[in-house]
C-alpha cells in the first residue's frame, strides 16, 4: 500500500461530491479523504502500488481541479 498526499483546490462539499465517484470506483484507490478545513485542501489517498502521483493529478485535473504532490 502507498500513501499519496496532494494539495488541491477542492474546497467544498460540493467539489468533493464531484470527485467522489471517480475515487470510490477506482480499482487502485483503497481509501481517500479531502480536508477542506486545511489551507492546502489536502487530498490523502491510500492506494495500491499501481497508482502513481501523476495518475491522480491527471484524474483530478480532468474534473477542472488543481492537484499537486505535497510529499514530492
What do these predicted regions represent?
Residues 7, 20, 46-72:
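C-terminal structural segments of small proteins and small subunits
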